[in-house]
Regions:
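Conserved "ABC signature" C-loop
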Residues: 517-565
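Cytosolic ends of transmembrane helices, especially the final helix of ABC transmembrane type-1 domains
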Residues: 294, 298-302, 317-321, 327, ...
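Loop segments that connect adjacent transmembrane helices in multi-pass transporters
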Residues: 291-342
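ABC-family ATPase nucleotide-binding domain "signature/switch" substructure
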Residues: 527, 561-649
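Membrane-integrated ABC transporters
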Residues: 1-165, 179-183, 209-237, 241-244, ...
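A hydrophobic transmembrane-helix motif
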Residues: 127, 171, 175-180, 243-285, ...
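Primarily ABC-family ATPase nucleotide-binding module
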Residues: 71, 75-79, 215, 219, ...
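Helix-to-loop junction immediately C-terminal to a conserved catalytic motif
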Residues: 492-493
Length: 649
């Protein structure tokens, strides 16, 4: 079944982008948050323009003071331009814009707490971006004067401007280097913040569990990839695109005037040509988004199939299932490569279009500018400047056409990450709805009129169950599929679908031990202390807990601080005993045991249950063995259609 959504460059894509990107800069729970964010970005840009205004005036003053020959003889037009910026109305306008910018940020200070870094870095990047654009404009004039002086054989002017060019390069190198460094650091900080944000929400309200159990939406495939890779791609590409768009706008504004002064026809023709090219690129981009989306999903499926083999290598080896696993892995590889073949075709089509689009634009420049030169209406240096201005504007206007492959890939990431973001926001709301089990805090476990349903349906696994476990231990029995494990999960508080009331200790006083205990990636000390942090228990306490379960040899064989793959080193029986050692060490009020002694012999099983009784830990068990009866005093047998039988043992 294909769950791929419909893709388009539309409002849905824009909304998902904003909802994912905005929280780093401005909280989403503020009234009119999107409008306020837009205003802050605009006033930041306008404030930089105002600062640039005053900087150019200052630069003109410094050049006129220390290099009067340059401003009077070589660049008189620059001096005229600087003097025009000294108009009182322009000065007042820039001061007003700066005041509005300061006021806008001041009124939103309470919303920008812990968000000073992104705004500071963004402000620095915008300043550097204006500086780079200014350098490009200045270099276009320098190249113009250099070529004109060569053509007219004005040696002195040539050498003077060559020195100016050298100075401009020396000035440009640190600015460009710092500009690129700041962009990369901004992306790094954004990725760190957004990843932490997603991870914290992923572990809240058991989202990781609900998504994995497919109880809400099967479209959220490979959340690990979305967190680790899609966020990285989103932050880096978003930053690149937004800065490139701003740079394109500055370039268009800066160089269009130069191009328009040389040839109005060339400027108009360029705009029409770019509009047609962009329209064609967007049409092809719609198809590319779907292909990129599928490629990300299929590559993740292929990678997961290899991880699945690694995690289940022993079972595969016992079953001699190598041939089947090879077929499964290669099937996923084939699906990824098949989609990649389609991607190659469309990439080739777009590459051909981009090549023709870029190279055909050389003809208008030759056709329209050359006659002006032959008619002696422009000098030779103006041709060079026309080339520079034309291709600067052409590149800026063609940002969509030239980047359509990256934009399509980026849009696919937005859909994946945006969908994941929406689901992480939806789950807490789902958990707060009325069709959920009501939980109360109590020292004992009691259930009142409890009905447990399957995810996304009204089918009852258990209906109207009531019992009280004061000084009693419960054994749950029944055929496979009648809801035994679901009831344990409901009592634990991780399965909330249904109705009724459960009273139980808080989460810190409940421990769950499944048939195959969870082995964390850590040391032996971390393993037995889990879920508490390392250092919570002394070495003697840990050693005593292991000794009670007959596992003291693990310290001698492996060391307490050695990090190993415990799920592979230990047998299932050893893992189950280690799980009981965790319970003995952590001393919860109640233990939830889901066939937790299935791999133990009778001696170790009896020892484990005896330790629970000796430490006054109440427990609820699921099991099939008849010898489990002696460890419990209450039996609950579940049958199909939600019915049950509750009796004393």
């Amino acid at each position: 079944m294909n769950n791929t959504p419909k893709f388009n460059f539309n409002k849905e894509l824009l909304d998902r982008f904003i909802n994912t990107a905005q929280p780093y800069f401005f909280p989403t729970d503020v009234k009119k948050s999107k409008l306020k964010l837009l205003i802050l970005i605009l006033v930041s840009i306008l404030s930089v323009i105002s600062i640039s205004h005053f900087f150019i005036i200052f630069l003109g003053f410094m050049l006129d003071t220390f290099f009067p020959k340059f401003t009077n003889d070589l660049a008189p037009n620059f001096k005229i331009y600087v003097n025009s910026l000294k108009e009182p109305n322009l000065i007042y306008l820039s001061l007003g814009v700066l005041s509005i910018g300061i006021y806008s940020f001041y009124t939103n200070l309470k919303h920008l707490q812990n968000r000073y870094r992104p705004w500071l870095l963004l402000f620095i990047i915008i300043i550097l971006l204006f500086s780079v654009t200014g350098l490009n404009v200045g270099l276009s004039y320098i190249f113009r004067f250099l070529d004109t002086s060569l053509n007219t054989r004005e040696e002195k002017v040539f050498w003077d401007f060559l020195w100016v060019y050298g100075g401009a390069v020396l000035l440009a190198v640190p600015i460009i280097a710092f500009y690129r460094f700041t962009r990369l650091k901004f992306g790094r900080y954004w990725r760190e913040w957004l990843t932490n944000n997603f991870i914290s929400r992923y572990f809240n309200y058991r989202c990781y569990y609900l998504l994995d159990s497919n109880s809400l939406n099967s479209d959220i495939d490979n959340p690990d990839q979305r967190i680790s890779e899609d966020i990285k791609h989103f932050t880096s590409v978003t930053l690149d695109f937004l800065i490139d768009i701003l740079y394109a706008i500055l370039t268009i504004v800066s160089f269009s005037a130069i191009l328009y002064s040389i040839s109005k026809t060339l400027t108009l023709g360029l705009i029409i040509y770019v509009f047609i090219g962009t329209w064609i690129a967007i049409l092809t981009g719609k198809k590319m988004i779907r292909i990129y989306y599928d490629q990300l999903r299929l590559e993740a499926d292929f990678r997961y199939s290899l991880v699945h083999v690694r995690d289940n290598s022993e079972s595969i080896a016992f079953y001699r299932g190598e041939k089947k696993e090879v077929n499964n892995v290669l099937k996923r590889l084939f699906n990824a490569l098949k989609n990649f073949d389609l991607l190659i075709i469309w990439q080739s089509i777009i590459d051909l279009f981009q090549f023709m689009y870029s190279n055909l634009m050389r003809f208008p420049v030759y056709i329209l500018v050359a006659p002006l030169y032959f008619a002696k209406e422009i000098d030779f240096g103006t041709i060079t400047q026309a080339w520079i201005a034309f291709f600067q504007v052409f590149g800026a206007l063609s940002i969509v056409t030239n980047q359509i492959e990256n934009i399509s890939s980026f849009a696919a990431s937005i859909f994946r990450l945006g969908n994941f973001n929406e689901m992480l926001n939806k789950i807490p709301d789902e958990e707060k709805t009325n069709n959920r089990i009501n939980y109360l805090i109590s020292n004992n476990v009691s259930v009142d009129k409890l009905s447990v349903t399957t995810p996304g349906s009204d089918k009852y696994l258990i209906k109207d169950l009531s019992f009280d476990l004061i000084n009693q231990n419960l054994l749950i029995k029944g055929e496979s599929g009648v809801g035994k494990s679901s009831l344990l999960r409901a009592i634990s508080g991780i399965w909330t679908m249904g109705k009724g009331e459960i009273s139980k200790p808080d989460f810190s006083n409940i421990m769950f031990l499944p048939q195959k205990p969870y082995m964390i990636l850590g040391t032996l000390e971390e393993q037995i202390s889990y879920p508490k942090q390392q250092g919570e228990y002394s070495f003697d306490e840990i050693k005593e807990a292991l000794n009670k379960l007959g596992l003291e040899y693990l310290i001698n064989d492996h060391g307490i601080n050695s990090t190993k793959d415990w799920s592979r080193i230990l047998s299932v029986g050893e893992q189950q005993r280690l799980g009981f050692a965790r319970i003995i060490l952590n001393k919860p009020k109640i233990a939830i045991l889901d066939e937790s002694t299935s791999a133990l012999d009778e001696r170790n099983e009896e020892n484990a249950y005896k330790l629970l009784k000796d430490t006054s830990i109440a427990y609820v068990s699921v099991g099939h063995r008849s010898n489990l009866n002696k460890f419990h005093n209450l039996s609950l047998e579940l049958t199909k259609n939600g019915s049950y039988k509750l009796e004393k043992i």
